[in-house]
Amino acid sequence: LGGCVRDDLVGYSSLFKYADPDLVASKVKSSLDEGFGIIKLHETGVAEVAAARKSAGPNVPIMVDTNCPWTPTEAYDMAMKLKPYDLLWLEEPIFPPEDFSSLAKLRADSGVAIAAGENACTAFQFREMIKAGAVTYAQPSVTKVGGITEFRKISALAALNGVQLMPHSPYFGPGFLATLHLTAAEANPGYVEWFYLDREACLYGDAIKPVNGRYTVPN
């Protein structure tokens, strides 16, 4: 569906929230040792982000997903405190997530790249988000927006407005497979999220398991 631009995609290690700088540093190191070259944290503290950057070194892209914890004022304060750690993006820093005008102001005032969209359910919401200038990276979730057709509408909307698509995909089953195939059809594919945890088994065996931080898109 949509054709296949490539069958090799870049993945990133998406860590849980640990709220422990030493544990964050350890998980970052083990992710890098396993071949991932991009790391996402789920932290809301400066100490944890600092520990991740120290563990990763200066050249590894690091993102921080905060899951909508802050007011606009708090988000600006934290964005400035996190700026020295050179984040690729700051994800969902403001509650409520549909406060696109505040996200746009934060993005403009802080100069920090903003990612959002996992809580948006239609192309109409993404249109408003992008129109407001709220995001550098748009993050539709194929399981939340209603499937492949709506995802493709959002993809086209993002491309038309110069916004990079970075799908939200912390899944293990059909949603993850759909994300892989949709991303493979993108002219400018984003990175694909891999929840970094020990699995008893993978639903599809080794077919979707990243090797050295990359996926081979299954047929």
How would you describe each model-predicted region?
Residues L1, L157-A159, A184-A185:
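Alpha-helix C-terminal capping segments
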Residues L1-M63, N67-Y76, M80-P84, Y204-N219:
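N-terminal capping/lid subdomain adjacent to the active-site entrance of alpha/beta enzymes
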Residues S14, G117, H168, W194-F195:
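Conserved beta-strand termini and adjacent loop/short-helix elements that scaffold enzyme active sites
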Residues L41, V46-Y171:
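Catalytic core of soluble alpha/beta enzymes
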Residues T149, I154, P170-N219:
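Flexible C-terminal active-site loop/helix
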